[in-house]
């Protein structure tokens, strides 16, 4: 076998430059000098006999050849990481890291409790939780950057054929009110009562907002007629606003378990209407599945009955 015209260190430098946007920042992230980075790139261009960067541009702009090298180089590095994880697994779970992805609400309110159960049983395994949008998490699974993910949104169409998407559990979205609201004395309200409320919501592009609007419309409730007091960008902000008496809101039951237990919020049901969304587990069948990932799925995720019962 002939020697390769590049090294893993050179590929890592390329990846760092692409990520950081400059030779200087790449050098800092790798804890090496900038001249060392420049020298490695010069050697790589000489070995491959191609220009990797556009020298006419002051910024680190890849040429077409450089883009191709970066794309395949990232695949090589990803496979190397996968190889290391597989070898680490052979040590019978005596260590290693499990990387889990989750969408915003799921990652904030559900996964920490489940990870706690896992860490209690397997303290020798480190766990990383990456919380992002469903789309970003799905791409991380596809690229092998996370072992598995639990999401509440729709996986991008372009990834659905590459990933295994398993329905996990239904997550109910509850209508919450301030404790002093007149409806807080009721257990159930009627559909028409919704038009009398002032709502605090997530923005229209959020997955939860779309689920709520769709289900309400299916039950003959025109959410476009709701009085929207304000739109906020986090569930925590919405809960605080409701507690302050600013309005009502729909949020995941998993996000209000503590507040309901302490009597800080009131959950009122709507006659004949239940709003649910399905949480899904996503994995990449074409990637190596770590033993820790399998154990988390079989022993921990199966313990989950409903978000409110954890």
From Swiss-Prot:
Principal place of residence: plastid
Pfam families in the cross-refs: HTH_1, LysR_substrate
Gene3D superfamilies reported for this sequence: 3.40.190.290, Winged helix-like DNA-binding domain superfamily/Winged helix DNA-binding domain
Keyword Chloroplast: yes
Keyword Transcription regulation: yes
InterPro entries found in the cross-reference section: LysR_subst-bd (IPR005119), Tscrpt_reg_HTH_LysR (IPR000847), WH-like_DNA-bd_sf (IPR036388), WH_DNA-bd_sf (IPR036390)
Domain of life: Eukaryota
Keywords, in A-Z order: Chloroplast, DNA-binding, Plastid, Transcription, Transcription regulation
HTH lysR-type domain sequence ranges: 6-63
Record's GO cellular component terms: chloroplast
DNA-binding region: 23-42
GO terms of molecular function: DNA-binding transcription factor activity; transcription cis-regulatory region binding
Compartments it resides in: Plastid, Chloroplast
Function per UniProt: Trans-acting transcriptional regulator of RuBisCO genes (rbcL and rbcS) expression.
Family matches, as PANTHER family: HTH-TYPE TRANSCRIPTIONAL REGULATOR, HTH-TYPE TRANSCRIPTIONAL REGULATOR CYSL
Assigned protein family: Belongs to the LysR transcriptional regulatory family.
Protein name per its UniProtKB record: Probable RuBisCO transcriptional regulator
Origin organism lineage: Eukaryota, Cryptophyceae, Pyrenomonadales, Geminigeraceae, Guillardia
Gene for this chain: rbcR
């Amino acid at each position: 076998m002939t020697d390769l015209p590049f090294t893993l260190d050179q590929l890592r430098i390329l990846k760092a430059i692409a990520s950081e946007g400059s030779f200087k920042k790449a050098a800092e992230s790798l804890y090496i000098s900038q001249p060392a980075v420049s020298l490695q790139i010069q050697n790589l261009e000489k070995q491959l006999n191609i220009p990797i960067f556009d020298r006419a541009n002051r910024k680190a702009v890849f040429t077409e050849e450089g883009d191709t090298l970066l794309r395949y180089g990232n695949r090589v590095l990803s496979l190397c990481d996968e190889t290391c994880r597989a070898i680490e697994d052979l040590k019978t779970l005596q260590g290693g890291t499990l990387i889990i992805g989750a969408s915003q609400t799921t990652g904030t309110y559900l996964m920490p409790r489940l990870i706690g159960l896992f860490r209690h049983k397997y303290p020798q395994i480190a766990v990383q939780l990456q919380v992002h949008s469903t789309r970003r998490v799905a791409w991380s699974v596809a690229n092998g950057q996370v072992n598995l993910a639990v999401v509440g949104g729709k996986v991008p169409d372009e990834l659905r054929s590459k990933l295994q998407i398993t329905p996990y559990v239904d997550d109910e979205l509850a209508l919450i009110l301030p404790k002093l609201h007149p409806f807080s004395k009721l257990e159930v309200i009627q559909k028409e009562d919704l038009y009398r409320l002032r709502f605090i919501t997530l923005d229209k592009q959020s997955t939860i907002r779309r689920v709520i609007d769709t289900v309400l419309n299916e039950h003959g409730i025109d959410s476009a007629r709701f009085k929207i007091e304000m739109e906020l960008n986090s569930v925590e902000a919405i809960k605080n606003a409701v507690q302050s008496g600013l309005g009502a809101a729909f949020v995941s039951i998993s996000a209000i378990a503590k507040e309901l237990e302490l009597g800080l919020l009131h959950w009122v049901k709507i006659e004949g209407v239940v709003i649910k969304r399905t949480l899904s587990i996503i994995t990449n069948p074409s990637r190596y599945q770590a033993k820790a990932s399998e154990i988390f799925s079989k022993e921990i995720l199966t313990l989950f009955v409903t978000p409110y019962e954890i």
